[in-house]
């Protein structure tokens, strides 16, 4: 703001003019004090009149002198240039009425939003570069000479091998029971019961997990004809949140060449929900936030976080 005011303005004369204004105010105050006190401190009436007139004239001369000095300095101050060095952007340095033109707060909010967007975009880019979102080992590419696509061997594992992997995982976690069924042919469907906390329906394609649905322990997981209900969501918001996080975990645990490791890692992550309603958030230390417990589990440390605290 000082740079804008300094254009065409004598700052030294401006400072002296302020001092002259203070001196003029003092002189005027002395005039009124003289009028207020009147004729005092003299024995005779004639002496009091002469002293009052002399004092009053001195005060008026002081006012006249200070006023002349202020007029002289006002001519030396000069006028600020109407052309701002930054054109219209130079007006931003002025002090607008906050209620009418909240420009500064809006610019600050936009700046914070832009920085946050750039930060999250960088994180998303790094994660997408590390994790492949494709569910197979095939890689996209266009070659000049097309080759016949070979069926990945990891997608056609024998059912006995899948049963053996699921059985070993079931023995790893005593508090988790896994029931395997094949209602639609060779593709397996798992009903995972985690203590008395929740139930998870896992739809598999060989050893690749395609879909997960998390429901409460007391909720029905079967349709009217007795089959596993793989489409309806849970009636509780907390288990809907866990379903969303489980879908995110499927995209995180991706290793097409070793699908058994992927299933074991996912089940280890799922087992961390055994204390869904007992573990506090590792960041805020609270058990509930907006009526929900910490529904997020870190993929590496398995620590509990609220959905908003993990960011």
Curated annotation (Swiss-Prot):
InterPro entries for the chain: Mediator_Med27
Tagged with keyword Nucleus: yes
Disulfide linkage = none
GO MF annotation, one: transcription coactivator activity
State the GO CC annotations: core mediator complex; cytosol; mediator complex; nucleolus; nucleoplasm; nucleus; transcription regulator complex; ubiquitin ligase complex
Chief location: nucleus
Residues that span the membrane, as ranges: none
UniProt-listed GO biological process terms: positive regulation of transcription elongation by RNA polymerase II; positive regulation of transcription initiation by RNA polymerase II; protein ubiquitination; regulation of transcription by RNA polymerase II; RNA polymerase II preinitiation complex assembly; somatic stem cell population maintenance
Q: Where does it localize?
A: Nucleus
Q: Locate the N6-methyllysine modifications and list their residues.
A: 134
Please give the subunit comment from the record.
Component of the Mediator complex, which is composed of MED1, MED4, MED6, MED7, MED8, MED9, MED10, MED11, MED12, MED13, MED13L, MED14, MED15, MED16, MED17, MED18, MED19, MED20, MED21, MED22, MED23, MED24, MED25, MED26, MED27, MED29, MED30, MED31, CCNC, CDK8 and CDC2L6/CDK11. The MED12, MED13, CCNC and CDK8 subunits form a distinct module termed the CDK8 module. Mediator containing the CDK8 module is less active than Mediator lacking this module in supporting transcriptional activation.
Q: Mind telling me what this protein is named? A: Mediator of RNA polymerase II transcription subunit 27
């Amino acid at each position: 703001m000082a740079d804008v005011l300094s254009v065409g303005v004598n700052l030294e004369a401006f400072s002296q003019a302020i001092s002259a204004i203070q001196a003029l105010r003092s002189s005027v105050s002395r005039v009124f004090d003289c009028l207020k006190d009147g004729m005092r401190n003299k024995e005779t009436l004639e002496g009091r009149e002469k002293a009052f007139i002399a004092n009053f004239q001195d005060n008026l001369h002081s006012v006249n002198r200070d006023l002349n000095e202020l007029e002289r300095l006002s001519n030396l101050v000069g006028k600020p240039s109407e052309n701002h060095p930054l054109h219209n952007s130079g007006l931003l340095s002025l002090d607008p009425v906050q209620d009418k033109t909240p420009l500064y707060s809006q610019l600050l909010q936009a700046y914070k939003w832009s920085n946050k967007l750039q930060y999250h975009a960088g994180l998303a880019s790094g994660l997408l570069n590390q994790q492949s979102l494709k569910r197979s080992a095939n890689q996209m590419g266009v070659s000049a000479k097309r080759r016949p696509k070979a069926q990945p061997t990891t997608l056609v594992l024998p059912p006995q091998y899948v049963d053996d992997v699921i059985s070993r995982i079931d023995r790893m976690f005593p508090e988790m029971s896994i029931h395997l069924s094949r209602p639609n042919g060779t593709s397996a469907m798992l009903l995972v019961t985690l203590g008395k906390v929740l139930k998870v329906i896992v739809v598999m394609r060989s050893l690749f997990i395609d879909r997960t649905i998390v429901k409460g322990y007391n909720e029905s997981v079967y349709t009217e004809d007795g089959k596993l209900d793989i489409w309806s969501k849970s009636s509780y918001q907390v288990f809907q949140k866990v379903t969303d996080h489980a879908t995110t975990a499927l995209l995180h645990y991706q290793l097409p060449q070793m699908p058994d490791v992927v299933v074991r890692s996912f089940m280890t992550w799922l087992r961390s929900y055994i204390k869904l309603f007992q573990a506090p958030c590792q960041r805020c230390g609270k058990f509930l936030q907006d009526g929900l417990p910490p529904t997020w589990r870190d993929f590496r440390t398995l620590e509990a976080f609220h959905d908003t605290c993990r960011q």
